[in-house]
Amino acid sequence: MENWYWKYDSAINADQCAEIIKMGDNQWHSGKVDTVDGNAEVGTGRSSDIVFLDDRSVYELLEQFALDANDNAGWRYELTAAQPIQLARYRVNEFYDHHLDSIGSHFDPRPRKLSLCVALNDDYDGGKFDFTMSSGLAEEEIATGTVIVFPSFLFHHVTAVTRGVRYSLVGWYTGPPFK
């Protein structure tokens, strides 16, 4: 694979990012991890709070990046739907261990093909978004508004936040099984 991920630096303006963060006010709950058997559980591999957003404008905003990256990166996966968009909050010492998104979801049996992550702020320390590659770790510096799109079968993680609060937006795009 030539392009393991596709990055859009500061593609969403800071005001839009702040508005998205506000959508999570008073709705936060502990993030769960989907397991291989299709269940979701609060586990030791993840420590963060999440909110699933149901705002059409956010779906439309993210979809343009997913479709563009799918084409420009050369993946050209058949995508048929977007799963619920997740707003995540990581406070000091919170993290998300190495994982892949393609295992599936307890609420949608279709395979996840593309994942998308948006940095909604950058006024924190730690909280690095990394890919685990066969060649080693690919660490990305992510400024506010940066969008990263990648195949859902790539291992990735978020390191522990050491100062401040990290906010991100995550989306997944599904389609028929790979052939």
Segments (PLM) and residue ranges:
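Fe(II)/2-oxoglutarate oxygenase catalytic core
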Residues: 1-147, 153-179
